[in-house]
From Swiss-Prot:
Keywords: DNA-directed RNA polymerase, Nucleotidyltransferase, Transcription, Transferase. InterPro entries: DNA-dir_RNA_pol_omega, Pol_omega/Rpo6/RPB6, RPB6/omega-like_sf. PANTHER family: DNA-DIRECTED RNA POLYMERASE SUBUNIT OMEGA. It comes from the Bacteria. This is DNA-directed RNA polymerase subunit omega. The keyword Nucleotidyltransferase applies. The RNAP catalytic core consists of 2 alpha, 1 beta, 1 beta' and 1 omega subunit. When a sigma factor is associated with the core the holoenzyme is formed, which can initiate transcription. GO terms for biological process: DNA-templated transcription. GO terms for molecular function: DNA binding; DNA-directed RNA polymerase activity. Belongs to the RNA polymerase subunit omega family. Promotes RNA polymerase assembly. Latches the N- and C-terminal regions of the beta' subunit thereby facilitating its interaction with the beta and alpha subunits. It catalyses: RNA(n) + a ribonucleoside 5'-triphosphate = RNA(n+1) + diphosphate. It comes from Ehrlichia ruminantium (strain Gardel).
Length: 132
């Protein structure tokens, strides 16, 4: 694929923003040492990731679940951090994101880290394949 366009990748997902999540996760995997499944010559990992998605050579559900797990690990580190900026903030000045993230994380509990048990994808029609 000499010139890859977003439209060529849209057959795998119904939303450009979801495509960005998928490509980002795959590029992260490639940067971490994963082997590409397509042949490429001096292409950047972002282009390789989009090519793999467009050629339907990846399980997009698995890729999305990996992205969710990576995001949850990041959020868990942020919420549980001993960062002096977060610790010394007065309770009145806690920003809305941090307050909501902390309360939602406490409500979800430890079981929320298991993507298979999560109802996050139920009924969302998150991925549209050409077979559907």
């Amino acid at each position: 694929m000499a010139r890859l366009t977003v439209e060529e990748c849209m057959g795998r997902t119904n939303n450009k923003f979801k495509l960005v999540i998928l490509a980002s996760q795959r590029a992260h995997d490639l940067n971490s040492g994963a082997s590409p499944v397509v042949k490429h010559k001096n292409s950047k990992n972002t282009i390789v990731a989009l090519t793999e998605i467009a050629n339907e050579q990846l399980d997009v559900h698995l890729l999305f679940n990996l992205a969710v797990q990576r995001c949850r690990k990041y959020m868990e580190k942020f919420i549980n951090s001993d960062d002096s900026y977060v610790v010394h903030k007065s309770k009145d000045n806690i920003d809305i994101f941090q307050k909501n993230a902390t309360s939602n994380f406490d409500e979800l509990g430890a079981n929320s880290l298991n993507v298979e048990n999560s109802k996050f994808l139920d009924g969302d029609n998150f991925f549209l394949t050409q077979k559907e």
